[in-house]
Each structure stands twice: as structure tokens, then as C-alpha cells.
Amino acid sequence: MNQLSERERAVLLEALDDEYHAWATYDQVITDFGDVAPFTNIREAEARHIEALLSLFHLFSLQAPHNSWPGRVERYPSLLAACEAGVSAEVANAGLYDRLLATTESPEIAVVLRRLRDASQQRHLPAFRRCVERQRDGGVAQQGCNEGSGRRWRGGRL
């Protein structure tokens, strides 16, 4: 396997840190509000995103850091606030992945980053937007905010 540049190592570290942060945030929401959709589904998806990135660390023989985010993420006063934060995070996620994609020459890295960005924009963002709408329309916490079906990637959904 080709050696990665320092920039590409930094790309992988930044992407993994972002996915770790997302997972820890959604896990905290579940801790605070219970098993509520779309957080339960998207937390599972974030775990698959982490697995996809960890496979790249393995492919390039890099040591992956552990997730340092649990217990260090923002907490929200309501499920509506958490859903709104989810929208903002997924919007920002697209910009992050576009920036990271512009700096890598590795086709293996680019494929994974594109899939993660697309999952975020095509599934997570709409799920959080629906959740915001439903929370504003009556505080429906456990029904109707489902993420929807996802695509498969190497044995797991993204």
C-alpha cells in the first residue's frame, strides 16, 4: 500500500474525530432523553462510519486514537434543541467532508469520505429536519422521526 502523506494522515484523524464527536453527542442525547429516533438510528450509523474510517487506519497501518468525546459533549435542554443541533452538525459535516476530499489524492480515502458525506446529507440531515418539524408540531419524541433505510458499505450500512 502506498505511504500516506502527512496531510492525508491529518485528513483521516480529522474525519475520525468528527465521527467520534457525532457518536458521543448522539449517545448523550439518548442518555438524556431515552431511546428516541432519529438519534438511536443515527448513533448506529455513526458507529458504522467510525468502522469505515478505522478500516482505512488498518489499511494504511496507522494507529487510530480512541474516542475521547464521551462525557465532553454539549447537552441539550430539550429534544427540539438536540434535533436542531443535529441539523446544524450535519450541515457542517458536508463542508468538512468537501474540504477533506479536496486535500486527498488517495482513491481509497476519497471513496470512504464521499460515502460518509453522502450518508450524512442524504439520510441524517433529512431525518433531523423531520425531527425538528415534528418536535415543533407537538413534541412527538418517539415516533415519526425515523432515519429511513440506509445503503450498505462493506457489510454495514453507512
Please describe what each predicted stretch is:
Residues 1-158:
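Non-heme di-metal
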